[in-house]
Swiss-Prot record:
Origin species: Methanocaldococcus jannaschii (strain ATCC 43067 / DSM 2661 / JAL-1 / JCM 10045 / NBRC 100440)
Designated gene of the protein: carA
Function: Small subunit of the glutamine-dependent carbamoyl phosphate synthetase (CPSase). CPSase catalyzes the formation of carbamoyl phosphate from the ammonia moiety of glutamine, carbonate, and phosphate donated by ATP, constituting the first step of 2 biosynthetic pathways, one leading to arginine and/or urea and the other to pyrimidine nucleotides. The small subunit (glutamine amidotransferase) binds and cleaves glutamine to supply the large subunit with the substrate ammonia.
Domain (Glutamine amidotransferase type-1) ranges: 171-354
Active site (UniProt): 246, 330, 332
Pathway, per record: Amino-acid biosynthesis; L-arginine biosynthesis; carbamoyl phosphate from bicarbonate: step 1/1; Pyrimidine metabolism; UMP biosynthesis via de novo pathway; (S)-dihydroorotate from bicarbonate: step 1/3
The protein, known as: Carbamoyl phosphate synthase small chain
Enzyme superclass (EC): ligase
EC number of the protein: 6.3.5.5
A UniProt-annotated Pfam family: GATase
Length: 354
């Protein structure tokens, strides 16, 4: 099958298609993880994005449902240098997702690094004419920026779900903005009961569950669009312990009156170094975000707890008095290092400060 990747600046790359025969639009981003393509594709934070892997060979070890981070593929499309197994091709076909291979991903990665993420179109078909490519380029240019699309409603649970454990020592209400399953697993493994609720659940409904703490999950898109969620978080501050991961860190910062901004190409990979400003320890972390918190916008009673050692951006915040903290990186990994798994223990300990 033929395949073409069309960028809004007019760049056109032709390659070989795999997966579903269709066309999709989205923001083209890259991730530097060397393994974990199943976890990447099923991560809800990639909704609205076409994901490119910088590692050249994908599919080497097949596909297993145990590796899923949601109920299926959430990325809009997949860009790789070379696919090495039919399992990955079948996986994309099962979830109606197109992929392109046999293109210069190093060129594309450098382009995004230098110019920033771009709107793009990926099409896979038996034949693709020049006229079709010209028409798709015009559609790419008109396509909405990711900041103008409501993505969280597409990946959040529709109904509350209870994840029980045999001997619960804490209860967490998880505001699901597109949660990765390993976040839930990591809490349940620590004997924490998790009540997963839709992203727009009202604060008074959350409190009816009598949580020991509230966790705001990761998810896709621009945090500033989630005004209803931010309002609910504001009403929870000072009432119940709160923590957050990735998008949750941004939403908590906005609830405190801070600001967020879109990064040039974001942090997506499994080797991002962060520094704990309290202990001065450095951890290698898994990350997947295209927005960040503006440090100087945070109020005096909120301090930065972690920074990224590559670009000095905010990687976590902590309230100076209240039992509230959040991190921009992913302590649950999947894929990536487990260096900061201890933060789930810190989350559960928040109940002792109620």
């Amino acid at each position: 099958m033929e395949a073409v990747l069309i960028l809004e600046d007019g760049t056109i790359l032709k390659g070989k298609g795999f997966g579903a025969e269709k066309e999709v639009f989205g923001e083209l981003v890259f991730t530097t993880v060397m393994t974990g393509y199943v976890e990447v594709l099923t991560d809800p934070s990639y909704k609205g994005q076409i994901v490119m892997m910088t590692y050249p060979l994908e599919g080497n070890y097949g596909v297993k449902k145990d590796w899923f981070e949601s109920d299926g593929i959430k990325a809009e499309g997949f860009v790789v240098r070379e696919v090495t197994s039919k399992a990955l091709d079948d996986f994309l076909k099962e979830y109606d997702i197109p992929g392109i291979q046999d293109i210069d991903t190093r060129f594309l990665t450098r382009k995004i690094r230098d110019k920033g993420v771009v709107k793009s179109c990926l099409k896979v078909a038996e034949e693709i004419s020049d006229d079709e490519i010209s028409e798709l380029l015009e559609r790419v240019k008109r396509y909405s920026d990711i900041s103008d699309i409501d993505l969280v409603p597409l990946v959040s649970t529709k109904e509350p779900k209870i994840h029980k454990t045999a001997n619960p020592k804490a209860r967490c209400v998880l505001i699901d903005c597109g949660v990765k399953l390993n976040i839930i697993r990591s809490l349940v493994q620590r004997n924490c009961e998790v009540i997963q609720v839709p992203y727009n659940t009202k604060y008074d409904e959350i409190l009816e569950y009598k949580p020991d703490f509230v966790l705001i999950s990761n998810g896709p898109g621009d945090p500033a669009r989630l005004k209803e969620v931010i309002k609910n978080i504001k009403n929870l501050i000072g009432v119940v312990p709160i923590t957050g991961i990735c998008l949750g860190n941004q939403l908590l910062s906005l609830a405190f009156g801070g600001e967020t901004y879109k990064m040039k190409f974001g942090h997506r990979g499994g080797n991002q170094p962060v520094k704990d400003l309290k202990t001065q320890k450095v951890y290698i972390t898994s990350q997947n975000h295209g927005f960040a918190v503006r440090k100087e916008s945070l109020p005096d009673d909120v301090e930065v707890s972690f920074i990224n050692l590559n670009d000095m951006t905010v990687e976590g915040i902590r309230h100076k008095d209240l039992p509230i903290f959040s991190v921009q990186f992913h302590p649950e990994a999947r894929p990536g290092p487990h260096d900061t798994m201890f933060l789930f223990d810190e989350m559960i300990k928040l109940k002792d400060r109620k």
